[in-house]
Amino acid sequence: MKTLVLLSALILLAFQVQADPIQNTDEETKTEEQPGKEDQAVSVSFGDPEGSSLQEESLRDLVCYCRTRGCKRRERMNGTCRKGHLIYTLCCR
């Protein structure tokens, strides 16, 4: 199960890297200076739509956040997120 979560986090990271265009340095500094923009929600679903053993209630919706300061109380670090040239911590619960 941990392998599946890690693999899903890496796939999400790959999609995010491909989706985000490379930003100029000026735009990155503006992003860094804006408070409250540090957390981004990501929803992960496991299994196929027909149903499988992986679609248990606890694994159906894994909510992940890209955080700058580390994970919160009930979250675990599952990798990293990248937006432009900035690297964040991927925290899931």
Swiss-Prot record:
The keyword Disulfide bond applies. Pfam families: Defensin_1, Defensin_propep. It is found in: Secreted. Belongs to the alpha-defensin family. Residues 1-19 form the signal peptide. Its main location: secreted. This is Alpha-defensin 23. Residues 20-58 form a propeptide. GO terms for cellular component: extracellular space. May have microbicidal activities. Keywords: Antibiotic, Antimicrobial, Defensin, Disulfide bond, Secreted, Signal. It comes from Mus musculus (Mouse). Disulfide bonds join 64-92, 66-81, 71-91. Residues 24-54 are annotated as: Disordered. It comes from the Eukaryota. Residues 27-40 have a biased composition (Basic and acidic residues). GO terms for biological process: defense response to bacterium.
